[in-house]
């Protein structure tokens, strides 16, 4: 009677490996979250540190720019440094313009990467395009690496676009320019993928993307792309923007496609605020998937928005504190307390919805609103277990959460 998201689109499964770590994109695998560094890749230590931060935040693949000989030479050192730190997240090399040369001249770089990103719009010009694209595919075959053929409308193959514009002009009923652009993106991606297959790369080694900046543009392109091929698909706006605008745009575009069963891996291309951690894009990607019920990454905190009954900021401060605490604990809890990522915590501001929401969560607290009895009942698995009062409600509630996690999700509990 009631429906959720559409069944997942069937696609080829692409395995991305490093050591004992396997991340599968597509097939029956969950939708993956990936990210990209913004360090100078030639700075091996700085890049390794940021990769570690992104991996600890939950990024399952991390892309790094490989744009110069110095960057290519640093990749093996980055991989070695990460392995020493116990960080086995696969690295994706992002190549533009000179990737065919860097993969040829720096074989250790080619081997240290787990996946290559190729942009068919700038792999070469004119007659050189086919040979330089072929060289990159041959490197992927030689080193047994999957590739993402990533088309961007900001760097689209201009020869292809010009030819399609000419063909469109000769139609009895020409398409709108926007439709020609969509078709050029799709033809560039699928045509390049089919050429890679002709060169010997398996379909289970290819991921496709067609990135644009507009929400409706992305949805239109991916709906058609998904209909016309069986390759695994990487979703993301090419530039989402800063702050709430970037988050809203990414959520709208990616959420619409995921709801239709389209998409196998996502990257949220947020412009970080000055001084803000790069890990924000990972958190947003995870929260999109978790909010849609597609995956679970960390306990969810439900909190009311507040109203005239909640003139105190206590519930807001407590919700933020608990949410931050849960996120900070997840790198450890993920391995020690399997299943904790599905836990729900409610922090409510008054008696209207507080007790009801708290009973529906694994753990909930209903703080007193304006004029209410200054007491905060705590509910665990639907039952009222305690009433907190005084100045230390936050500390006491955090301890209750911590004790519940250890008791409910600890290895001993899991075995019983």
UniProtKB/Swiss-Prot annotation:
Highest taxon, organism lineage: Bacteria
Residues at which [4Fe-4S] cluster binds: 304, 307, 350, 357
Residue runs in coiled coils: none
Annotated cofactor note: Binds 1 [4Fe-4S] cluster.
Protein's pathway: Isoprenoid biosynthesis; isopentenyl diphosphate biosynthesis via DXP pathway; isopentenyl diphosphate from 1-deoxy-D-xylulose 5-phosphate: step 5/6
Catalysed reactions listed for this entry: (2E)-4-hydroxy-3-methylbut-2-enyl diphosphate + oxidized [flavodoxin] + H2O + 2 H(+) = 2-C-methyl-D-erythritol 2,4-cyclic diphosphate + reduced [flavodoxin]
EC class (word): oxidoreductase
SUPFAM superfamilies according to UniProt: Nitrite and sulphite reductase 4Fe-4S domain-like
MF GO annotations: 4 iron, 4 sulfur cluster binding; 4-hydroxy-3-methylbut-2-en-1-yl diphosphate synthase activity (ferredoxin); 4-hydroxy-3-methylbut-2-enyl-diphosphate synthase activity (flavodoxin); iron ion binding
Protein keywords: 4Fe-4S, Iron, Iron-sulfur, Isoprene biosynthesis, Metal-binding, Oxidoreductase
Cofactor: [4Fe-4S] cluster
EC id: 1.17.7.3
GO BP terms: isopentenyl diphosphate biosynthetic process, methylerythritol 4-phosphate pathway; terpenoid biosynthetic process
Pfam families with a match to the protein in the record: GcpE
Physiological role: Converts 2C-methyl-D-erythritol 2,4-cyclodiphosphate (ME-2,4cPP) into 1-hydroxy-2-methyl-2-(E)-butenyl 4-diphosphate.
NCBIfam families from the UniProt entry: ispG_gcpE, PRK00366.1
Family: Belongs to the IspG family.
Protein name: 4-hydroxy-3-methylbut-2-en-1-yl diphosphate synthase (flavodoxin)
Organism: Burkholderia pseudomallei (strain K96243)
Gene: ispG
């Amino acid at each position: 009677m009631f429906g959720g998201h559409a069944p997942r689109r069937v696609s080829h499964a692409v395995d991305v490996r490093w050591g004992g770590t396997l991340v599968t994109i597509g097939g029956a695998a969950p939708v993956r979250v990936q990210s990209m560094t913004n360090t100078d890749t030639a700075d091996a230590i700085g890049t390794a540190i940021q990769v570690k931060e992104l991996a600890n935040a939950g990024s399952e693949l991390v892309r790094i720019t490989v744009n110069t000989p110095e960057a290519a030479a640093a990749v093996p050192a980055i991989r070695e440094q990460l392995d020493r730190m116990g960080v086995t997240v696969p690295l994706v090399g992002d190549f533009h313009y000179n990737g065919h040369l860097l993969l040829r001249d720096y074989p250790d770089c080619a081997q240290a990467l787990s996946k290559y990103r190729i942009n068919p719009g700038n792999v070469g010009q004119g007659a050189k395009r086919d040979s330089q694209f072929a060289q990159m595919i041959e490197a992927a075959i030689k080193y047994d690496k999957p590739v993402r053929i990533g088309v961007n409308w900001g760097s689209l193959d201009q020869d292809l676009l010009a030819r399609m514009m000419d063909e469109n002009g000769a139609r009895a009923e020409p398409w709108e320019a926007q439709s020609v652009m969509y078709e050029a993106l799709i033809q560039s991606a699928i045509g390049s993928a089919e050429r890679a297959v002709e060169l010997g790369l398996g379909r289970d080694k290819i991921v496709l993307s067609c990135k644009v900046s507009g929400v409706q543009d992305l949805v239109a392109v991916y709906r058609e792309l998904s209909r016309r091929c069986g390759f695994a698909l990487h979703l993301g706006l090419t530039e989402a923007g800063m702050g709430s605008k970037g988050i809203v745009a990414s959520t709208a575009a990616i959420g619409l496609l995921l709801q239709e069963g389209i998409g196998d891996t996502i990257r949220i291309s947020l412009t970080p605020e000055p001084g803000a951690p790069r890990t924000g894009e990972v958190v947003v990607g995870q929260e999109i998937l978790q909010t849609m019920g597609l995956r679970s990454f960390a306990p969810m905190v439900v909190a009311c928005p507040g109203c005239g009954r909640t003139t105190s900021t206590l519930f807001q401060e407590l919700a933020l504190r608990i949410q931050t605490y849960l996120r900070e604990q997840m790198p450890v809890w993920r391995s020690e307390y399997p299943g904790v990522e599905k836990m729900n915590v409610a922090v409510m501001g008054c008696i209207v919805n507080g007790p009801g929401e708290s009973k529906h969560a694994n753990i909930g607290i209903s703080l007193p609103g304006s004029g209410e009895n200054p007491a905060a009942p705590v509910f665990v698995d639907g039952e009222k277990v305690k009433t907190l009062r005084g100045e230390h409600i936050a500390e006491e509630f955090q301890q209750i959460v911590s004790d519940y996690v250890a008791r409910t999700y600890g290895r001993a509990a899991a075995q019983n």
